[in-house]
């Protein structure tokens, strides 16, 4: 039987299956952070159970850490208690922890790949919905709830229903200044936020094959915003080059054996997908969200759609409420909208490739006086590399705050957040009401679009900046 990549990964990890029951899958890698793990560890200890395979469990502090300093007290008492609990639990069960003072601390979905902990062919889980990021390596990676975190800690397995397979081919030619963030926002606009329910999405096509691993991670990171369980991309030479010589990858002969196996991780020719979509992005422009879900997005030179354009009454009502919350009106151009804050960071867009692109845009320019702009590297390694290249000096000279690593303003769980009705150009992945702070208004954009917005104090087509750089 010809199989999709998802089916291959799923079937190869079944350890027990009984008729009319969800199969039990073996989990190769369990990633843990401070927010969704305390209850799981507490329940585990109350039942006198242990972590079954601590060497396949890695932990970090990211969600509620302060990125202003490395003080465990900076984000409040609850955050401090959660971080202290993680230290205690990792010490007790001998789990590798990248804590606040570890040079490799960072966002869980950044440090896994950059350390070579994430590998093709794995099943990977974490108590975080954007675990789908790791699917860029040809891994079956998905978020789980706290009770499931406990189950994986105790058994290294998890009950999982079989899902359907969706195939999205992305083809065409892209203009300078168009990024993976623009691509995935456009895909979400075309397919909607619920099209992926019950599916794992495999991305392919000539565009995907040309993307770096950082960009592929952005695609898979936001597959969850279509309602999918995960996104996945078959590993190839780009994947292998990225992983080569990273700390936790196989070494010596084992590396060659791993490559041989990883090359088999692709959908069979003729494998049947439950849904397939071909998306041409040849004329794609930079994307900016205007509403309160990622599908409410337009090209920078377009205007916000009129409510009459929605045939579905539910979508029309959703758009109406989104505009009310965002303080916008149908027919408006986002180029006319001023912003107060810029956030460049998150597990979607905080890697070294993102920061290099931002530096090119802001070099020898100044952040608008009315804008508070922060750049938050995704990990200690990203921060060190950026500083080695002098990017931090470019950012600071331009008026950006250069921070320590963490999730920061992606979510209102730490000391970085929006105030009521503050408008933010953000490189994160969700623009829900209150996501970045109560009453805060989030516009999702690429790193270079966010950088340009910081300079001008409003949204602009970043391609005009690229064109001026070429002259």
Curated annotation (Swiss-Prot):
The cofactor remark states: Binds 1 [4Fe-4S] cluster per subunit.
List residues binding [4Fe-4S] cluster: 347, 407, 410
What is this enzyme's class at the first EC digit?
Answer: lyase
GO terms (BP aspect):
L-leucine biosynthetic process
Question: Which stretches are transmembrane?
Answer: none
According to the UniProt entry, what is the EC number of this protein? 4.2.1.33
Instruction: Please give the catalytic activity noted in the UniProt record.
Output: (2R,3S)-3-isopropylmalate = (2S)-2-isopropylmalate
Any single GO molecular-function term of the entry would be:
4 iron, 4 sulfur cluster binding
Q: Which CDD domains match?
A: IPMI
Recorded metabolic or biological pathway in which this protein acts: Amino-acid biosynthesis; L-leucine biosynthesis; L-leucine from 3-methyl-2-oxobutanoate: step 2/4
Say which domain of life the source belongs to.
Bacteria
Q: Which cofactor does it need?
A: [4Fe-4S] cluster
Q: Which UniProt keywords apply?
A: 4Fe-4S, Amino-acid biosynthesis, Branched-chain amino acid biosynthesis, Iron, Iron-sulfur, Leucine biosynthesis, Lyase, Metal-binding
Q: What does this protein do?
A: Catalyzes the isomerization between 2-isopropylmalate and 3-isopropylmalate, via the formation of 2-isopropylmaleate.
What family is it from? Answer: Belongs to the aconitase/IPM isomerase family. LeuC type 1 subfamily.
Q: Which HAMAP family match?
A: LeuC_type1 (MF_01026)
Self-association state and partner proteins as the record states = Heterodimer of LeuC and LeuD.
The protein depicted here goes by the name 3-isopropylmalate dehydratase large subunit
Originating species? Buchnera aphidicola subsp. Baizongia pistaciae (strain Bp)
Name the gene: leuC
């Amino acid at each position: 039987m010809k199989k999709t990549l998802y089916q291959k990964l799923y079937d190869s990890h079944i350890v027990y299956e009984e008729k009319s029951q969800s199969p039990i899958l073996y989990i190769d890698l369990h990633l843990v952070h401070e927010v969704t793990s305390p209850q799981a560890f507490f329940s585990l200890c109350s039942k006198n159970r242990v972590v079954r395979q601590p060497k396949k469990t890695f932990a970090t502090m990211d969600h509620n850490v302060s990125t202003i300093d490395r003080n465990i007290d900076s984000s409040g008492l609850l955050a401090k208690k959660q971080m202290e609990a993680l230290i205690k639990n990792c010490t007790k069960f001998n789990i590798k922890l990248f804590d606040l003072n570890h040079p490799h601390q960072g966002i869980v979905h950044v440090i896994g790949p950059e350390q070579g902990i994430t590998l093709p062919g794995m099943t990977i889980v974490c108590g975080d919905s954007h675990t789908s990021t790791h699917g860029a390596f040809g891994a079956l990676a998905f978020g789980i709830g706290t009770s499931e975190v406990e189950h994986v800690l105790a058994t290294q397995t998890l009950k999982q229903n079989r899902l359907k397979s969706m195939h999205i081919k992305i083809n065409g030619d892209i203009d300078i200044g168009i990024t993976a963030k623009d691509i995935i926002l456009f895909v979400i606009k075309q397919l909607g936020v619920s099209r992926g329910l019950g599916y794992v999405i495999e991305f392919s096509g000539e565009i995907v094959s040309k993307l770096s691993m950082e960009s592929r991670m952005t695609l898979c990171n936001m597959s969850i915003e279509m309602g999918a369980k995960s996104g996945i991309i078959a590993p190839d030479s780009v994947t292998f080059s990225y992983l080569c010589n990273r700390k936790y990858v196989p070494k010596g002969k084992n590396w060659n054996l791993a490559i041989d196996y990883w090359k088999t991780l692709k959908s069979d020719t003729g494998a049947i997908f439950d849904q397939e979509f071909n998306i041409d992005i040849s004329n794609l422009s930079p994307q900016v969200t205007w509403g309160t879900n990622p599908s409410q997005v337009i090209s920078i030179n377009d205007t916000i759609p009129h409510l009459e354009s929605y045939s579905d009454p539910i979508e029309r009502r959703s758009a109406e409420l989104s505009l009310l919350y965002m303080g916008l009106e149908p027919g408006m151009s986002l180029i006319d909208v001023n912003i107060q804050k810029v956030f460049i960071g998150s597990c979607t867009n905080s890697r070294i490739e993102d920061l290099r692109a931002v530096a090119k845009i802001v070099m020898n320019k100044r952040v608008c006086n009315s804008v508070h702009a922060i750049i938050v590297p995704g990990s200690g390694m990203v921060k060190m590399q950026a500083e080695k290249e002098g990017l931090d000096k470019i950012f600071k000279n331009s008026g950006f705050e250069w921070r320590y690593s963490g999730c920061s303003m992606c979510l209102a769980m730490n000391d970085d957040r929006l105030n009521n009705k503050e408008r933010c150009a953000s490189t994160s992945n969700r623009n829900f009401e209150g996501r970045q702070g109560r009453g805060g208004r989030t516009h999702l954009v690429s790193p270079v679009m966010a950088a340009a917005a910081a300079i001008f104090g409003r949204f602009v087509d970043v391609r005009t900046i690229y064109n001026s750089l070429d002259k």
